[in-house]
Curated annotation (Swiss-Prot):
Listed GO MF terms: ATP binding; ATP-dependent protein folding chaperone; unfolded protein binding
Name of the coding gene: dnaK
Name recorded for this polypeptide: Chaperone protein DnaK
Region (Disordered) location: 613-653
Induction remarks: By stress conditions e.g. heat shock.
Function (record text): Acts as a chaperone.
Phosphothreonine: modified positions: 203
InterPro entries assigned: ATPase_NBD, Chaperone_DnaK, Heat_shock_70_CS, HSP70_C_sf, HSP70_peptide-bd_sf, Hsp_70_fam
Biased amino acid composition, Basic and acidic residues: 644-653
Domain of life (superkingdom): Bacteria
Keywords associated with the record: ATP-binding, Chaperone, Nucleotide-binding, Phosphoprotein, Stress response
Similarity section: Belongs to the heat shock protein 70 family.
Length: 653
């Protein structure tokens, strides 16, 4: 049976894991790394690079290298978080026709799910290379605080990548699964409440989760969740970049903020410095030839201490504490009732973050969970549960934000409150606001504000054909149904006429089914195109090697061939070199074959010369000893001879 893989689609890095029996396995990518940078580069020749190769060329191709695209997924262009990123990113963020935030690369507008699909495709390929079979199903993780639109967009990305997304699972919940089963397997299980503090590259989540043993089954119940989907390592990097720009301007009088190439180098240097300062107290940021002016090239050399870094990002770390406070309150527990604090996400390696977490929860956070891999591992465990290969795990997740509809006066009437265990259903009866009202518009919102306008509108639909009646008389039942992925389905039914209308909330933006299908087809075409390119490269390499080999042999042994043979080989060589300049794979292969055939006689000459040279060398070195060796070998074995170890002992004189 095909495996359901677990994918942590991260803002900065992504990771893929599978279950092998009851053991989890994080799969290394083609570069041998267990995590892959979530970076995608679009080359001039149409090639798409993903991961480390995309990261390596970012400095020379900043406008067409996309990173942190997860921050845009499922968002509108007008949202303040998106507007903030427009000024910071070297690539172009543009408004799509439906109002979504898209990116523009080489004159083409791309939807964030389409870009994220490239990373998912790399994860899929990584798993397929390891398993030796096609992978079609996956569990993909999202930040717990992702809204409906962001979850839908992530699911769409999976479809575009050729994956059937069996479940969207919250990142902290996945980490709790990995932690809980690990502790259960080492015999240190039992009922416990844990806090998962997840500070990644672009998002922050906090979840309070209860792990209980119920009749031999491990039950993971999320008590509450909170967070900020626009707070993470990228923001920490930006603080360092801003500091470097300010210092350089003070020293050199040059503003680097308008230099796209310099900014890309600064980003790389800032990230490196931030990571180094988790293990050392000071680091040097050295960027020779960072820019130039009329006086010549400028070099950047700045010392950054851990204390300075902590001062720069203190406010960002502090911003994670308010959601922690809310999550504890919503869960109905106190910090003293938390048994374990789990750190997830690369940013939790920062000593100041660990210190802040310890200060809030009153205990040392655990260090035995890999912050980069735990989420993918948890997703793989959930995949095993969904495949029916594991029966001892039950996961009870929650919806992170309240869901409701707009009622008279623009009020948000909550249908499902935040932190409700999912899947769940809820129905409530409403009526009309005007006499003889023939239709009602159901506007669906997500958020905690009292007025609907302060929340995120997810979608709207009409229920038409209401029988004429005084206001307040018609009975309209509105039902909300959240599935296990946290995706919402809404229905409205006129109890009087029996008329009803239902929608799966796709947000009032998002990708249409046709757009998704087109992107799936484009992805398949790209895969076929990539295969063609690979085959062409292989044919070219083979031809190149053949040309080189024949040229070398011709230079060394060509004088032993008659003129006709030599001319034939030289002609075939010329044809092969001409074919190599083109893009026709069949032509390259045909000319390589012809060269191979034409150079057969040359090969025979080379082989004959080698044999003769070896025979001559053997005769010169061996002299008359060879027959003696043969004679020795033919003597019968002495039955009394035994194998023994010996050591040389010098005579004592």
């Amino acid at each position: 049976m095909a495996k359901i893989i677990g994918i942590d689609l991260g803002t900065t890095n992504s990771c893929v894991a599978i279950m092998e029996g009851n053991t989890t396995k994080v799969i290394e990518n083609s570069e041998g790394a267990r995590t892959t940078p979530s970076i995608i580069a679009y080359q001039e020749d149409g090639e798409v690079l993903v991961g480390a190769s995309a990261k390596r060329q970012a400095v020379t191709n900043p406008r067409n290298t996309l990173y942190a695209v997860k921050r845009l997924i499922g968002r509108k262009f007008t949202e303040k978080e998106v507007q903030k990123d427009i000024d910071l990113m070297p690539y172009t963020i543009a408004a799509a026709e439906n109002g979504d935030a898209w990116v523009e690369v080489r004159g083409n507008k791309l939807a964030p799910p389409q870009v994220s699909a490239e990373v998912l495709r790399k994860m899929k390929k990584t798993a397929e290379d390891y398993l030796g079979e096609t992978v079609t199903e996956a569990v993909i993780t999202v930040p717990a605080y992702f809204n409906d639109a962001q979850r839908q967009a992530t699911k769409d990305a999976g479809r575009i990548a050729g994956l059937d997304v069996k479940r969207i699972i919250n990142e902290p919940t996945a980490a709790a699964l990995a932690f809980g089963l690990d502790k259960h397997n080492d015999g240190k299980g039992g009922d416990r409440k844990i806090a998962v503090y997840d500070l990644g590259g672009g998002t922050f989540d906090i979840s309070i989760i209860e792990i209980a043993d119920v009749d031999g089954e491990m039950q993971f119940e999320v008590l509450s969740t909170n967070g900020d989907t626009f707070l993470g390592g990228e923001d920490f990097d930006q603080r360092v970049i801003d500091y470097i720009i300010a210092e350089f301007k003070k020293e050199q009088g040059v503003d680097l903020s308008k230099d796209v190439l310099a900014l890309q180098r600064l980003k790389e240097a800032a990230e490196k410095a931030k990571i180094e300062l988790s293990n050392s107290t000071q680091t040097d940021i050295n960027l020779p030839y960072v820019t130039a002016d009329a006086s010549g090239p400028k070099h950047l050399n700045i010392k950054l201490t851990r204390a300075k870094l902590e001062a720069l990002v203190e406010e960002l770390i502090e911003r994670t504490i308010a959601p922690c406070r809310t999550a504890i309150k919503d869960a109905g527990v106190s910090t003293s009732q938390i048994n374990d604090v789990i750190l997830v996400g690369g940013m939790t390696r920062m000593p100041k973050v660990q210190e802040k977490v310890k200060e809030f929860f009153g205990q040392e956070p655990r260090k035995d969970v890999n912050p980069d891999e735990a989420v993918a591992v948890g997703a793989a465990i959930q995949g095993q549960v969904l495949a029916g290969d594991r029966k001892d795990v039950l996961l009870l997740d929650v919806t992170p934000l309240s869901l409701g509809i707009e009622t008279l006066g623009g009020v948000m009437t909550k249908m499902i409150t935040k932190n409700t265990t999912i899947p769940t259903k809820f129905a409530q009866t409403f009526s009309t606001a005007d006499d003889n009202q023939p239709a009602v518009t159901i506007k669906v919102f997500q958020g905690e504000r009292e007025l609907a306008s302060g929340n995120k509108m997810l979608g709207e639909f009409n229920l038409e054909g209401i029988a004429p009646a005084p206001r307040g008389m018609p009975q309209i039942e509105v039902s909300f149904d959240i599935d296990a992925n946290g995706i919402l389905h809404v229905g409205a039914k006129d109890k009087g006429t029996g008329k009803e209308n239902k929608i799966t909330i796709k947000a009032n933006s998002g990708l249409s089914e046709e757009e998704i299908q087109k992107m799936v087809k484009d992805a398949e075409l790209n895969a076929a195109e990539d295969k063609k390119k690979l085959e062409l490269v292989q044919a070219r390499n083979q031809a190149d090697a053949m040309v080189h080999s024949v040229k070398k042999s011709l230079a060394e042994h060509g004088d032993k061939l008659d003129a006709g043979e030599k001319e034939k080989i030289e002609s075939a060589l010329k044809d092969a070199e001409t074919a190599l300049k083109g893009e026709d794979k069949a032509e390259i292969e045909a000319k390589t074959e012809a060269l191979m055939s034409a150079s057969q006689k040359l090969g025979e000459k080379v082989y004959a010369d080698m044999q003769a040279a070896q025979a001559a060398a053997g005769a010169a070195a061996g002299g008359g000893e060879a027959p003696a060796a043969e004679a020795t070998a033919s003597k019968p074995a002495d039955d009394n001879v035994v194998d023994a170890e010996f050591k040389e002992v010098k005579d004592q004189k």
